[in-house]
Design a protein with these regions (language model features):
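Acyl-donor binding region in acyl/amide transferases
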Residues: 41-120
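Non-catalytic substrate-recognition and accessory regions of acyl/acetyltransferase enzymes
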Residues: 1-54, 129-148
Length: 148
């Protein structure tokens, strides 16, 4: 994320209490993440221009959770993903995020489900709440997440 985007992406997440800072048992930072709960219109707008400044309504206006920012510079990506599925979004049928190497491999939406949601319930929700994408984008449902 460019530095000039911090004011529109990171600070509102903190103000809305939609961020997490994961720490190791020794007190070292493992990961930082921020999320929003989009409605379908905000989701479509985000997918059209994911560097846009979100309005206050966009941060918590719907039931489509999106990880907007995730950084694990010291190797805490696995712990962060596990924490997301087991704690933060444990009851969510799906949480979405953009693949971090989209410029190299093409835009992709990755999807995970919370640990308390069955694979069938997640798949049903996914099929009923497909992202409205105008630009070509690949949608990847995490098969491993669905199966276990």
């Amino acid at each position: 994320m460019p530095l000039h985007m911090m004011a529109s992406q990171i600070f509102p997440a903190i103000a809305n209490k939609q961020y997490a800072l994961g720490m190791s048992e020794k007190g070292s930072p493992l990961f930082y993440m921020a999320w929003a709960n989009f409605d379908d219109a905000a989701e479509a707008e985000y997918l059209t221009n994911y560097n846009l400044a979100l309005t206050p309504h966009n941060w918590n206006g719907g039931d489509r959770p999106w990880i907007l920012f995730f950084a694990a510079p010291f190797g805490g990506a696995y712990e962060g993903e596990r924490w997301i599925k087991e704690n933060l979004f444990k009851d969510s049928p799906e949480v979405r995020f953009l693949y971090h190497e989209g410029k190299k491999r093409g835009k992709r939406i990755l999807c995970k489900r919370g640990k308390n949601v069955s694979a069938m319930a997640s798949l049903k929700w996914h099929n009923e709440n497909m992202p409205l994408v105008a630009a070509p984008m690949q949608l990847e449902k995490d098969v491993a997440s669905l199966l276990g």
